[in-house]
Amino acid sequence: MAPGEQQLSLVPDDTIQGSLFAPEPSEDKTEESERPKQRRSHPGRRTAPAAQHNEDSSNNDDEGLPRWHHHGLVDPLALTPMLRHYVELKAAHPERVLLYRLGDFFECFFEDALLTSRLLELTLTGKEGGKSIGRVPMAGIPHHAAERYCSELVRRGHAVALCDQLETTAAKGALLKRDITRVLTPGTVLEEGMLAARRNNWLAAVVLDDEQRWGLAVADVSTGELLLHERQGTTELQQQLLQLEAAELLLPGIEAAEWCPDGLGLTQQPRTPFEAASADRALKQRFGVRNLEGLGLADHPLARRAAGGLIAYLDASQPGSTVPLERPQLVFAGDALVLDHQTRRNLELTATQRDGQFQGSLLWAIDRSHTAMGGRALRRWLEAPLLDATAIRGRQEAITELVEQRPLRLSVRRLLRPMADLERLAGRCGAGRASARDLVALADGLERLPLLADLLKSSSAAPLADLQQPRPDLQQLAELLRFQLVDQPPMSLSEGGLIHDGVDEDLDDLRNRLDEQENWLAGVEKRERKASSNPNLRLQFHRSFGYFLAVSRAKATAVPDHWIRRQTLSNEERFVTPELKEREGRILQLKARSHQREYDLFCRLRDQVGEQATAIRDAARAVASLDALAGLAELAATQGYCRPELTDGRCLEIEGGRHPVVEQLLSESAFVPNSVALGHGDKPDLVVLTGPNASGKSCYLRQCGVLQLMAQMGSWIPAERAAIALADRIFTRVGAVDDLASGQSTFMVEMAETANILQHASERSLVLLDEIGRGTATFDGLSIAWAVAEHLASAPPHGLGARSIFATHYHELNALAGSHSNVANFQVVVEEQDAELVFLHKVMPGGADRSYGIEAARLAGVPPSVVQRARQMLERIEGGQPLAC
């Protein structure tokens, strides 16, 4: 954390914070930890940490730190047995925050205590470390709130190792058995509270050879997806990583290189798991195959190595459980429309260019899906539009059917609205992490599949066919879950109340015996009321004291002789009887056996669900596609979209097109539609677009790119009519800023982006350029702009012949239309009314000869004196007069 950066604190519940700290009991009683009585004031406020608290600092100055601020400073043999074990585990996981279960809390010590107390705003306290050690730093969190706190640590990029208790009762004179049961890292979390619901949480691993050929494995452990890439060139690798925005990237034995995007969470790994033999062995074991030909990986050695190393990392982070992964799927370069990072950023696909916000992005504007899995599916479609015309038409057919059949669309969306995230629920079940409430939510979702199948039985669109077939195995699973689990199970899995009566004979027998004991307790209460002549006597239970008889202080002096005083409170006295204490042991033993039996039954049921994780995920992905399609249909039906016609060749013809984001953001005026026609018949390949500043040229460029992209998603688009041929790539260069990190000026950034376009565009590409050459001297800029435009318009081999729109203030470029038959001039028109400039935002044929820059400056609020002086200088320039006088 940089100095001055604010740290985000979690706001603890008052009940949690109040019970989090208590005095340390004597050593001979429990292993519980000492907790101070005071609470930190304002625990939920954001505070700026002091400079010395910079967690990323390499400063070794220990001034102001506790004596034992690092576990490596102590002699393990001088520590208490519990802390000695903690230090042994910490030495094995030095880069991870170690949370060590002690009773109802997870504790951390030494440097981890200092870190968590600062990041999570926990009170830093201490624990006795040994006679020669004294007190060592300690901080703790309640075990039932661990997910909340761990989520914050993971969000900040820290890995967390959880050391849990492996037994409930220790042998006499021994510590409870504890060990690492889970490692939480940004790329391996499964818990719902640690994941963004509507986007994948990618874990990636890269293997690079000496010839810059690379293999990339990408897994989402929460959904089971495993994607493999193998290609050439680190530039393409960088683009792939920028697109993925992986939560964590595994690098085997190499440091971060220039191709590694800034801000990516990197985890260094040993080379061995990524070597060919180890990786192949891991893949065969995970997927139960004797050779890798069956997985289609025989000819992709680097992808295999990356996948094998990733699987080894997952196995190490999930001891005792196996995260269910689907068989690997190879992804090839020509599978989807290519969108480089700059194009994604310029078109604002998932975040706005100015401030990185979701609201205002294209995904924000078009996402009408109801489920988390539908939202993830739509995001994937947006990030990887199709190149297969058949697949695109299939999605179009489904949307058309749902648009035209409004009752069907509304019924489908009503069924989908409450559906849980079946894809991730299946993953948690397979990994043994699902709760009882997760299984109930899963049952509810599976019960909706037959209802969806019935609604879609007459549908003819291919994407809807996957849900038309009955799934008897999943229907039986839903029935099993409903039969065994109560409708509203508790959060805890260890305190009973999960399983219906009639499911298990042994459990029913234990419950019947407990009912008998409850009847006996009711009889005791009735009998003791009579014996004490106190009708207000209550028989109660406390976790620490067991069963007791409670009477008011006023009645406490007249109790029977066989009562034994146990506790005195301000308003009541508590007593026990020999008979009650003798029976208490039997009751508690029965409860423990009953709870354990329920837990065992639940785990068995969860394992049964996990065995069908693949089938559940298949159904979930079909539901996700339906949800995404139904959402796009709702958008099309309510926003006046049209179905674009897919054509062969290079046609891009859109009548009355609108920008889907801008038209939703406009509140006081209607969006002005505009048309475009490129790449076929007598239509140009290159449009030179001129017009005033702030008139809408950049919006028009983005609109054309967005509508091409939406069409290749299979979506309808905001237009009156459209005929669109498939593009292999979309390139945009709209605006540029200095790249301070690499020392590049605005002009150099602009030229680098332009060079990338000219090197990779083809006749089938769509190229959208704004203001090429503006960052240098006027004549240099004009010359560059002319040459670039001419190269785009010229057919191969002399140029690219790409469909292009070139927005510029160099009005000299209008002359290109006179020398190139496939170039046309268009302008964004304005009107001058009473010396005022009125922007019409309408694109019309013909080239502009003025940019109205001074009028735009006036509208932007430039002082009148400066505007007037600018007009004077313009007159001098246009009149050929010297500027200085």
Curated annotation (Swiss-Prot):
Ligand binding (ATP): 691-698
Any one GO molecular function term: mismatched DNA binding
GO cellular component: a single term: cytosol
One Pfam short name: MutS_V
Domain of life of the native organism: Bacteria
PROSITE patterns tied to this protein: DNA_MISMATCH_REPAIR_2
CDD domains tied to this protein: ABC_MutS1
InterPro entries on file: DNA_mismatch_repair_MutS, DNA_mismatch_repair_MutS-lik_N, DNA_mismatch_repair_MutS/MSH, DNA_mismatch_repair_MutS_C, DNA_mismatch_repair_MutS_clamp, DNA_mismatch_repair_MutS_core, DNA_mismatch_repair_MutS_N, DNA_mismatch_repair_MutS_sf
Biased composition range(s): Basic and acidic residues: 26-36
SUPFAM superfamilies: DNA repair protein MutS, domain I, DNA repair protein MutS, domain II, DNA repair protein MutS, domain III, P-loop containing nucleoside triphosphate hydrolases
One Gene Ontology term from the biological process aspect of the record: mismatch repair
Renumbered residue ranges of the record's region Disordered: 1-67
UniProt keywords, alphabetically: ATP-binding, DNA damage, DNA repair, DNA-binding, Nucleotide-binding
Family membership: Belongs to the DNA mismatch repair MutS family.
Function, as annotated: This protein is involved in the repair of mismatches in DNA. It is possible that it carries out the mismatch recognition step. This protein has a weak ATPase activity.
Name of the molecule in the record: DNA mismatch repair protein MutS
Organism: Synechococcus sp. (strain RCC307)
